[in-house]
């Protein structure tokens, strides 16, 4: 202990900044010197379900260092006090807060965590993460977050229709956006994401959400992930020329999304019901830069989709297939389809495909025929892995 106490205050503060806030606070009992060191830690994490810890930090927080880089708060309905969030937020924002995360998951609609209005005009805020239906996003008209680069909204409540459009329009440097809607998000009718600077976008939409179209205009996007469980897929997505990677999980009607992600190098697909028809698929959808394709098999006639993708991915190098263990066939397999397929061998099989992985293989006729076709036609194949 004597050797540690001999270190300068700056180094001691750096050391205790790597431990949980509760542990950092407990060091205040070690000696007179240690009594105030934790107050200079720039990152705070507080579980507000522990009244003693909450009260101690709130009592001492006004004396905190000039800058609070990160604040992480966790609330529960039974221990939530409305004045807490106002006090926490006000103090943190006045100390040049850069990162804020609030978790408040509750099975009840009320009470809501109402964020202080000053949060929506915080010039220093770079990262904002709000998780839980207990949090209500009430965006004021004067919202302005000039430094915000990362925004996560997971299952939060919204005060009025279309608050997201207002919020996003006032984040001029936003780069990373995650939106996860919940069954209770009735105020979000049409999801509109128009952010010229956005580079990463993740959307999760449950089946119970509105079937209204959502609009995405993100010309600088590099990574796109969408999980849409609605039966009716309805979206307008403008061209994303910078896109490098996409993860798509939909129930059906995947064509619109595929048309928007043709520039990707890595593509992951999961479609619950197969709606692709090789004779009706939109012309001109070619994945010229696609090198790695990962496909989850969970629908009948999945080979139609795979072959179509192979035919339109001339430079594909890696193919990963994963058969869903819960997948059950509802239609009779038509083996005659392979006669037509083998007349036109995809270009990637002749010149670029080097790796094949097939997980969840069960030796069904369609699987056997597909693998037989690949092994016969893939001239450049170097490695393959087949597993149950």
From Swiss-Prot:
Q: In this protein, which residues make up the domain named F-box?
A: 1-47
Report the domain of life of the source organism. Eukaryota
Where is the FBD domain positioned along the sequence?
Answer: 337-388
- One Pfam family name is FBD
The record's listing under InterPro entries reads: F-box-like_dom_sf, F-box_AtFBL13-like, F-box_dom, FBD, FBL13/AtMIF1-like, LRR_dom_sf, LRR_FXL15/At3g58940/PEG3-like
Q: What is this protein called?
A: FBD-associated F-box protein At5g60610
**Protein source organism:** Arabidopsis thaliana
């Amino acid at each position: 202990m004597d050797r540690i106490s001999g270190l300068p205050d700056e180094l001691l503060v750096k050391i205790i900044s790597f431990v949980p806030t509760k542990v950092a606070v407990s060091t205040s009992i070690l000696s007179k010197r240690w009594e105030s060191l934790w107050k200079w830690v720039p990152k705070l994490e507080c579980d507000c379900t522990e009244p003693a810890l909450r009260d101690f930090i709130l009592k001492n927080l006004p004396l905190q260092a000039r800058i609070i880089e990160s604040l992480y708060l966790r609330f529960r309905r039974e221990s939530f006090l409305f004045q807490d969030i106002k006090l926490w937020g006000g103090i943190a924002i006045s100390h040049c807060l850069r990162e804020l995360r609030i978790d408040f998951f509750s099975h009840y609609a009320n009470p809501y965590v109402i964020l202080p209005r000053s949060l929506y005009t915080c010039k220093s805020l770079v990262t904002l993460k709000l998780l839980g239906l207990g949090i209500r996003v009430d965006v004021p008209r004067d919202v302005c977050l000039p430094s915000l680069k990362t925004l996560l909204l997971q299952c939060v409540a919204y005060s009025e229709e279309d608050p997201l459009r207002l919020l996003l329009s006032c984040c001029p440097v936003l780069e990373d956006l995650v939106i996860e809607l919940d069954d209770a998000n009735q105020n979000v009718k049409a999801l509109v994401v128009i952010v010229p600077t956005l580079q990463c976008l993740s959307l999760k939409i449950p089946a119970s959400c509105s079937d209204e179209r959502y609009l995405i205009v993100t010309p600088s996007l590099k990574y796109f992930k969408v999980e849409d469980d609605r039966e009716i897929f309805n979206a307008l997505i403008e061209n994303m020329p910078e896109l490098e990677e996409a993860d798509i999980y939909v129930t059906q009607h995947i064509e619109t999304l595929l048309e928007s992600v043709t520039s990707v190098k890595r593509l992951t697909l999961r479609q619950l019901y197969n709606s692709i028809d090789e004779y009706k698929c939109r012309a001109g959808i070619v994945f010229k830069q696609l090198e790695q394709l990962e496909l989850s098999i969970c629908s009948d006639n999945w080979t139609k989709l795979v072959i179509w993708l192979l035919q339109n991915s001339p430079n594909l190098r890696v193919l990963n297939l994963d058969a869903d263990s819960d997948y059950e066939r509802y239609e009779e397999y038509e083996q005659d389809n392979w006669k037509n397929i083998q007349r036109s061998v995809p270009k990637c099989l002749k010149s670029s495909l080097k790796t094949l992985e097939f997980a969840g293989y069960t030796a069904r006729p369609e699987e056997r025929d597909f693998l037989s076709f690949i092994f016969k036609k893939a001239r450049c194949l170097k490695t393959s892995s087949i597993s149950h």
